[in-house]
């Protein structure tokens, strides 16, 4: 629904395109670093997981915890991608809608935010529910407390999702402030032009950080 709204004139769409491209470039750069962290963390979890004794034989659930961690990280990154995509689409459409009425602008912006909120909740339920059912079936024939063990290994999913969200939040915050200060120094201090002026190229980076 958000994508179907009026995106404004050619100049607005051009600027929105620059911001969207910058946002995707930021995500790709962030994912490269996070993929290294996820790989190292998953290996450590695989070697330091829980061992269950079943009929005198050790049953290692550590590798399942590591897989849960990776799946949680992927789901969290997917939620971030969806949110960034929708945000960059909703921005320019909210601006165009504000030219007609405040009600329409609020509707477009609120709907764009709703997509992210429901996307996070939906992916969390899908991931936790799907893995819980899968783990119940995996541990069913091993002679262990299936529910307890399934919940135990699900902590890997939560850890993966929270880790990516934390790094994305902190990394995005640092980028936002760096871009904001840089744009202000170059624009207002050196060039003497207003804040967020289209003549300042750093404004694009500033708006990427705002997303």
Report residues per predicted region.
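Hydrophobic, small-residue-rich transmembrane alpha-helices and their short perimembrane loops
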Residues: 1-211
């Amino acid at each position: 629904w958000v994508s179907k709204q009026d995106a404004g004139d050619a100049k607005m769409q051009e600027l929105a395109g620059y911001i969207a491209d910058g946002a995707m470039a930021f995500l790709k750069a962030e994912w490269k670093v996070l993929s290294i962290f996820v790989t190292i963390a998953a290996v450590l979890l695989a070697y330091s997981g829980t061992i269950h004794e079943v009929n005198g034989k050790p049953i290692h659930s550590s590798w399942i915890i590591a897989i849960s961690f990776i799946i949680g990280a992927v789901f969290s990154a997917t939620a971030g991608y969806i949110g960034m995509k929708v945000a960059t689409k909703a921005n320019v459409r909210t601006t165009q809608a504000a030219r007609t009425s405040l009600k329409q602008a609020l509707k477009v912006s609120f709907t764009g935010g709703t997509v992210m909120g429901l996307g996070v909740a939906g992916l969390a339920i899908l991931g936790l529910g799907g893995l819980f059912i899968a783990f119940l079936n995996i541990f069913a024939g091993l002679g262990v407390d299936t529910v307890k063990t399934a919940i135990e290994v699900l902590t890997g999913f939560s850890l993966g999702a929270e880790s990516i969200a934390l790094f994305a939040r902190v990394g995005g915050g640092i980028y936002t402030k760096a871009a904001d200060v840089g744009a202000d120094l170059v624009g207002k201090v050196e060039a003497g032009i207003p804040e967020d002026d289209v003549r300042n190229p750093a404004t694009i980076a500033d708006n990427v950080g705002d997303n």
